[in-house]
């Protein structure tokens, strides 16, 4: 008897994009372990096998502000793009951002509990949502401190408020540091790294990528003697896709982000990237 349910199959299909029978076979082979099944699907190169964790169709905006070496960024969601571009919704987001900056809140729970004219911010958001006729949610907040912090907001559509936001901090305070911080913030918006350095990547994820690279190389018929080099090359490629400082710089692909920062005499210390609905 299978040790997984129809709901498990549905969830795995949504995460990988693979067909129902392929998902069932992978779950059978993995003895019901969803994460192992994802590895199997990726190794076999099944069509559409891409992760879709956290996928959402939410509309809304990202807002950010930097003050005295502290960057604060929020994402506020609504149901339709019609409301997302409405003045009242944008004003509500501005109010939420102001509360986030002034309160010093570093997490969503604290932010939503912050008193605003005698009531918690969460109630203010619900009331404003009722006026707009849609459910409105403050989805997340990020707070980053550094010697220099840059905030960059990007519009994916000229008709909507910013859909992508980035905070990026470096450890220097020079003009060169500020320029580098901004340029790299723009890069982060475009290239969407998940980690600042290789040391930030969870070891189990690296080992998973290593296993996938090895099994894929074997499935491709690569010679045993070449496997180690091939695997290391593919793991390096993984780092170049996921790790900020390893990525090719968007404005000059001949240089890495690490080189851009080094030329400015700084190191990146933290970053956050929000995209509405993802």
Swiss-Prot record:
Residues 80-83 are annotated as: Involved in Mg(2+) ion dislocation from EF-Tu. Keywords: Cytoplasm, Elongation factor, Protein biosynthesis. GO terms for cellular component: cytoplasm. Its main location: cytoplasm. Coiled coil: none annotated. One of its GO terms (molecular function) is translation elongation factor activity. The keyword Ribosomal protein does not apply. It is found in: Cytoplasm. InterPro entries: EF-Ts_dimer_sf, Transl_elong_EFTs/EF1B, Transl_elong_EFTs/EF1B_dimer, Transl_elong_Ts_CS, UBA-like_sf. Belongs to the EF-Ts family. NCBIfam families: tsf. Associates with the EF-Tu.GDP complex and induces the exchange of GDP to GTP. It remains bound to the aminoacyl-tRNA.EF-Tu.GTP complex up to the GTP hydrolysis stage on the ribosome. This is Elongation factor Ts. It comes from Pseudarthrobacter chlorophenolicus (strain ATCC 700700 / DSM 12829 / CIP 107037 / JCM 12360 / KCTC 9906 / NCIMB 13794 / A6) (Arthrobacter chlorophenolicus). The lineage of its organism: Bacteria, Bacillati, Actinomycetota, Actinomycetes, Micrococcales.
């Amino acid at each position: 008897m299978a040790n997984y349910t129809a709901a498990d199959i549905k969830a795995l299909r949504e995460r990988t994009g693979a067909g129902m029978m392929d998902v069932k076979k992978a779950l059978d082979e993995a003895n019901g372990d969803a994460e192992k099944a994802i590895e199997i699907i990726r190794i076999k190169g099944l069509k559409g096998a891409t992760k879709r964790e956290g996928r959402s169709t939410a509309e809304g905006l990202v807002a950010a502000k930097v003050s005295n070496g502290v960057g604060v960024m929020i994402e506020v969601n609504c149901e339709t793009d019609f409301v997302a571009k409405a003045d009242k919704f944008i004003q509500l987001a501005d109010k939420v951002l102001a509360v986030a900056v002034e309160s010093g809140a570093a997490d969503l729970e604290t932010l939503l509990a912050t008193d605003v004219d005698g009531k918690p911010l969460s109630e203010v958001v619900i009331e404003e949502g009722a006026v707009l006729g849609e459910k409105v949610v403050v989805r997340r907040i990020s707070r980053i401190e550094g010697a220099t912090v840059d905030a960059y907001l990007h519009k994916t559509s000229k008709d909507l408020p910013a859909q992508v936001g980035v905070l990026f901090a470096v450890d220097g305070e020079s003009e060169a540091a500020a320029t580098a911080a901004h340029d790299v913030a723009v890069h982060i918006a475009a290239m969407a790294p998940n980690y600042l350095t290789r040391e930030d990547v969870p070891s189990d994820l690296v080992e998973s990528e290593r296993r996938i690279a090895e099994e894929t190389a074997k499935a491709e018929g690569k010679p045993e003697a070449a496997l180690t080099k091939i695997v290391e090359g593919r793991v390096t490629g993984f780092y170049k896709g996921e790790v900020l400082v390893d990525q090719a710089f968007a404005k000059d692909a001949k240089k890495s982000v690490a080189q851009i920062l080094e030329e400015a005499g700084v190191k990146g210390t933290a970053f956050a990237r929000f995209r509405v609905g993802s």
